[in-house]
Amino acid sequence: MTPRTTKSAHQAGPYTYEDFCAMVREDQKADLINGVIYVASPENTDANELFGWLFVVISLFAEARELGQVYGSRAALRLDGKNGPEPDIAFVLKAHLHRVHRSHIDGPCDLAVEIVSPDSVGRDYESKRRLYQEAGVAEYWIVDEIEEKVTLLRLDDKGKYREVRPRKGELHSTVLPGFWIRPEWLWQNPRPKKTQVLAEILGRLG
């Protein structure tokens, strides 16, 4: 198991969103949070495979149901002049695709997924939770490969995140109606085939 740590390369600033865009390369994973730029460490192969598996499953489901568009970890959310997080996975509903521009998403996505790495623990569980809640990201999934758990947070009618508990070992999304996963799938080696998982999920929808 990889040791947990909260250390991360960062540039304290304060920087604006425009500074962030000018300073960070397009191929570099980074976040702007409260004027501070956090540069992600290179991914290990396990995290990369986990990201790829989940990204494909969500993308195929969203496409099959014609719900919206899924974006990877280089899509920044321009929330305001000092905040531009880049979720590992961002889903935008069809009704909100006008927010999507070539270089960024203007405002919140509807669902954000963060895959926890040793240097992002504090940001994913604390800073980004607050930021996504305040911005109005309807669902926030924290996928913690280190602890082998998935935390699903959903905005309530007061705009506060509430944790959604599994039902019969499954986590169900409301932003993606009909979508669910078994967290255990993410930790299996090998993981179940993506096409088989999609067929099982879609099979319940008739």
Model-flagged regions — what are they?
Residues 1-206:
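Gly/Pro/Ser/Thr-rich low-complexity, intrinsically disordered segments predominantly at protein N-termini
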